[in-house]
Regions:
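Donor nucleotide-sugar binding/catalytic pocket of nucleotide-sugar-dependent glycosyltransferases
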Residues: 135-138, 142, 156-194
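Conserved acidic donor-binding segment of nucleotide-sugar-dependent glycosyltransferases
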Residues: 321-323, 327-334, 343-348
Length: 430
């Protein structure tokens, strides 16, 4: 089978990139696999090229490269095929529209898999008849803007399948009633770590992820203040950095100082690989308001750490068995987090049992098992292709109505944004 993945930027780092690379490497043992990265901003991918996988790009952002595309006239013209509702829309352009379209028109693959909503929509709009078309959802439907959800409900009907990473999100997609589109929940895969399992006797709690508001590290620090007061021999290590718009490192550092936790809570920055750092702890903590899946939960469990996590939508509750391989607590409940941590901290035997249970339970996320599930879906779709009646375009009337409403919505959003700028300027003058 020839499989082609379409990825936003395979040269960067992130959960979608990591899980795509892991899946591609597993599939490459039996199939011909390529990853097509829309963008390339560096010479070598941060995660390396998966063994047996071909990696190529469509738009070169390297200024020192002879193929630099930043001066192409279409690079500065807005995208019209890639949907405006996707949060990455401003990074796309008329050039990406053309390059992605040309790629899809010529790709020689049995299965084409797009890996973010905007690319899923573009796949539906530009791919010709022939290959099985799969849109992967690595986030959650309810977290998308209204504009993007509207395009999803309209365009995904042209796909063969949509896969989500949780059953809860699969139910949300099924509620869209996309005729003829197969919808399955297939979790992300996490390979077995190349380090020995964590020592349950280690007195370290580990957390990892971007330093952004949704992760609620401020709540975790407050909860750990109670832990440190009761068990001053324990430490909390938080790994990760913020993104360009929401780096909370300074605020968290001030909070640590104000709570007199300098000897107990540490902002560790980014670690790659992360597995050796997980293995230095005996507990993991997740305090997010929402998680599309919960990659760090599985990563921690694969290293032998039970996880205390908020029972937020959607992932944690489908990964952790409460009271067996971790604890689930209410969202935004500082006292519940500290109580759950202390319950495991103060129970050495219980913590060791939970660690063993985490190792066993997390085996279901092994790449071999997850790849086999994807292969099963794709093979069934390919086998039924002859009798499948998937449309390759919408009726002219329906398409015109969708486009007209979309244009009106875009005009409304633009007017609202301009009004907001004007109001802010007037406030500065008053």
């Amino acid at each position: 089978m020839r499989i082609s993945f379409l990825l936003h930027n395979g040269y960067h780092i992130g959960g979608t990139i990591r899980t795509t690379f892991t899946l591609a490497a597993e599939l490459a043992a039996r199939h011909e696999v390529e990853i097509v990265s829309v963008f390339r901003h560096r010479d070598e991918p941060i995660l390396g090229i998966p063994a047996g996988v071909t990696l190529r790009h469509l738009v070169d952002l390297r200024k020192n490269s002879p193929g630099f595309d930043g001066e192409h006239p279409d690079f500065h013209r807005p995208a019209r095929v890639f949907p405006r509702g996707d949060g990455r829309w401003k990074q796309y352009s008329a050039l990406t529209d053309a390059r992605i379209g040309a790629h899809l028109a010529s790709v020689e693959a049995d299965v084409v898999v797009a890996t973010r909503p905007g690319l899923n929509v573009q796949l539906a709009r530009q791919a010709p008849r022939g290959p099985v078309l799969v849109g992967q959802e690595h986030l959650i439907l309810e977290g998308h803007s209204y504009r993007l959800r509207r395009d999803i409900a309209h365009e995904y009907a042209l796909l063969d399948a949509v896969t989500t990473v949780t059953e809860a999100d699969a139910r949300a997609y099924r509620a869209l009633a996309l005729p003829g589109v197969r919808i399955d929940a297939v979790p992300n895969s996490v390979p077995a770590p190349g380090v020995p399992p964590a020592d349950p006797a280690a007195k370290v709690v580990v957390a990892a992820g971007r330093l952004t508001p949704v992760k609620r590290y401020d709540l975790l620090i407050d909860a750990f203040a109670d832990v440190a007061a009761a068990r001053p021999d324990w430490k909390l290590r938080i790994y990760g950095t913020g993104d360009a718009s929401d780096n909370l490192k300074k605020a968290l550092a001030r909070q640590i100082e104000q709570r007199s936790l300098r000897e107990h809570v540490f902002l560790m920055g980014t670690a790659h690989p992360m597995e050796p750092e997980w293995a230095k702890g005996s507990l993991a903590a997740v305090t997010s308001r929402r998680e599309s899946f919960g990659m760090t939960i599985v990563e921690a469990m694969r290293c032998g750490l039970p996880v205390v996590s908020t029972d937020c939508p959607h992932g944690p509750g489908e990964i952790i068995e409460d009271g067996v391989d971790g604890r689930l607590v209410p969202v935004d409940d500082t006292a519940a987090v500290s109580a759950a941590l202390l319950a495991l901290i103060n129970d050495d035997e219980g913590r060791a049992r939970a660690a063993k249970a985490a190792l066993v339970a997390s085996e279901r996320f092994d790449p071999s098992r997850i790849a086999a599930r994807h292969e099963e879906i794709w093979n069934e779709l390919a086998a039924g292709a002859a009798g499948r009646s998937r449309p390759r375009s919408h009726g002219r009337g329906r398409a015109l109505v969708h486009r007209a409403v979309g244009t009106a919505l875009d005009a409304g959003y633009t007017a609202k944004a301009k009004a907001g700028v004007l109001v802010r300027r007037l406030r500065r003058l008053v």
